[in-house]
């Protein structure tokens, strides 16, 4: 049977774009914690010695934006200029305005509408995806790239590899077989890690530590063989990193946030957006729908699309494709999805408890992926068992 190669990448929490996602979601958490009806569209950008938050926020919450920025950067590990940013001494710029009253009246009638009447915060289309190739019902390439990034951060923070610095990227290539539309991983073909490091460490030490402390604990032995290729800091030097190395911006890592290039993406980013923004809530509910189809044994692989018009509660369209892996026809699966899931934004927020912030609820989503996580706060990962009519 013919095989093919597919690749997914990830970046860890010290990457400048991911720093921005985490700041935006930390601000969302702070607003929702005090005022669950907060309307938040918060962007962040960063460059050497500077973090700026800007956007539209309407909330009754009292939020110290500067403190949130500094706390988030410090928590990631940006505590001195030589690691890429100094959380306590960098410039913090804030340019936050209120949500446009035009949007407010169209979406939630200035809070006068019932939940089922709340319109979508914008137009757009979102995709949810699931596959039976991993226990998380996520693509293996994406799962491994993401877990390598998380492990890099873990061994940095617990001092297993004290030479590590916060910024880093991973990439995994897997050889697959196509089994009647289902994706079956055969082996890991290539592992790539580029991580920021201090001045003292040699490239030999970097490669040895990454294999021992990052790759070996993450990638199951069954997928590795003598032909697996490793590229470990292939550029030869990565001392300058974080915002000092590259500018960062919220919403620049939308494939890493989702399915690693599998499925499809409507283009809307997640971080810094409250649940009336269907870019986020719509994508969460279609992940739940696709995952439920696969977990219920109705298909081995599934993609679901939903689309919206601004101010209109009901979705314009819902689409499903099981890549010819469905146990029943796709049209019957679509009927089950429509019966079991409410795609109106106000109802998604209630059913998935999306107005609850605080406790790093959204900030956690902003690094290492929004899907396939085993965490009670990720309510959209809860499966509904779908039963076709006998």
UniProtKB/Swiss-Prot annotation:
Listed name of the protein: S-adenosylmethionine synthase 2
Chief site of localization: cytoplasm
Organism: Actinidia chinensis var. chinensis (Chinese soft-hair kiwi)
UniProt record, GO biological process: one-carbon metabolic process; S-adenosylmethionine biosynthetic process
Pfam families the UniProt entry points to: S-AdoMet_synt_C, S-AdoMet_synt_M, S-AdoMet_synt_N
EC identifiers of the protein: 2.5.1.6
GO CC, alphabetical: cytoplasm
Biological or metabolic pathway of the protein: Amino-acid biosynthesis; S-adenosyl-L-methionine biosynthesis; S-adenosyl-L-methionine from L-methionine: step 1/1
Catalysed reaction equations from the record: L-methionine + ATP + H2O = S-adenosyl-L-methionine + phosphate + diphosphate
InterPro entries listed in its UniProt record: ADOMET_SYNTHASE_CS (IPR022631), S-AdoMet_synt_C (IPR022630), S-AdoMet_synt_central (IPR022629), S-AdoMet_synt_N (IPR022628), S-AdoMet_synthetase (IPR002133), S-AdoMet_synthetase_sfam (IPR022636)
Domain of life assignment: Eukaryota
Binding positions (Mg(2+)): 9
Location in the cell: Cytoplasm
Similarity-based family: Belongs to the AdoMet synthase family.
Binding site for L-methionine: 56, 99, 246, 277
Cofactor note: Binds 2 divalent ions per subunit. The metal ions interact primarily with the substrate. Can utilize magnesium, manganese or cobalt (in vitro).
Binding-site positions, ATP: 15, 167-169, 235-238, 246, 252-253, 269, 273, 277
Gene responsible for this protein: SAM2
Enzyme class, UniProt record, top EC level: transferase
The keyword Cytoplasm appears for this protein: yes
GO molecular function annotation: ATP binding; metal ion binding; methionine adenosyltransferase activity
Assembly notes: Homotetramer.
Cofactor(s) recorded in Swiss-Prot or TrEMBL: Mn(2+); Mg(2+); Co(2+); K(+)
Lineage: Eukaryota, Viridiplantae, Streptophyta, Embryophyta, Tracheophyta
Binding residues for K(+): 43
Function: Catalyzes the formation of S-adenosylmethionine from methionine and ATP. The reaction comprises two steps that are both catalyzed by the same enzyme: formation of S-adenosylmethionine (AdoMet) and triphosphate, and subsequent hydrolysis of the triphosphate.
Keywords, ordered alphabetically: ATP-binding, Cobalt, Cytoplasm, Magnesium, Metal-binding, Nucleotide-binding, One-carbon metabolism, Potassium, Transferase
């Amino acid at each position: 049977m013919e095989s093919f190669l597919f690749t997914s990448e990830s970046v860890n929490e010290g990457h400048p774009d991911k720093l921005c996602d985490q700041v935006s979601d930390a601000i969302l958490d702070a607003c929702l914690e005090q005022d669950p009806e907060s309307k938040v569209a918060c962007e962040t950008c960063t460059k050497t010695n500077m973090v700026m938050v800007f956007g539209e926020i309407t909330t009754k919450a009292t939020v110290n934006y500067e403190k949130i920025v500094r706390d988030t950067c410090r928590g990631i590990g940006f505590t001195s200029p030589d690691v890429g940013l100094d959380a306590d001494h960098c410039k913090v710029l804030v340019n936050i305005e209120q949500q446009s009253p035009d949007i407010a009246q169209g979406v939630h009638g200035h809070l006068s509408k019932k939940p089922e009447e709340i319109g979508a915060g914008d137009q757009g289309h979102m995709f949810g995806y699931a596959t039976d190739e991993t226990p998380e019902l996520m693509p293996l390439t994406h799962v491994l790239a993401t877990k390598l990034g998380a492990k890099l951060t873990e061994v940095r923070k617990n001092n297993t590899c004290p030479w590590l610095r916060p910024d880093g990227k991973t990439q995994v290539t897997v050889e697959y077989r196509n089994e009647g539309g289902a994706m079956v991983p055969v082996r890991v073909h290539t592992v790539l890690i580029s991580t920021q490091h201090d001045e003292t460490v040699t490239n030999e030490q970097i490669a040895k530590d990454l294999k021992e402390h990052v790759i070996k604990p993450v990638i199951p032995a069954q997928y590795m063989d003598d032909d697996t290729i490793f590229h470990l800091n292939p550029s030869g030097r990565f001392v300058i990193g974080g915002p000092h190395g590259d500018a960062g911006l919220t919403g620049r890592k939308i494939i890493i946030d989702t399915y690693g290039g599998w499925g499809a993406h409507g283009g809307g980013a997640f971080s810094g957006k409250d649940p009336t923004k269907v870019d986020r809530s719509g994508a969460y509910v279609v992940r739940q729908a696709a995952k439920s189809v696969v977990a219920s044994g109705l298909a081995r692989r599934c993609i679901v699309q939903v689309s919206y018009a601004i101010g209109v509660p009901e979705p314009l369209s819902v689409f499903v494709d099981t890549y010819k892996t469905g146990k029943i026809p796709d049209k019957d699966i679509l009927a089950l999805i429509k019966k079991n899931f409410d795609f109106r934004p106000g109802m998604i927020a209630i059913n998935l408890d999306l107005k609850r912030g605080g406790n790093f609820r959204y900030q956690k989503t902003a690094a290492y992926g929004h899907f396939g996580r085993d965490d009670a706060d990720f309510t959209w990962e809860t499966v509904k068992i779908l039963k076709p009519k006998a």
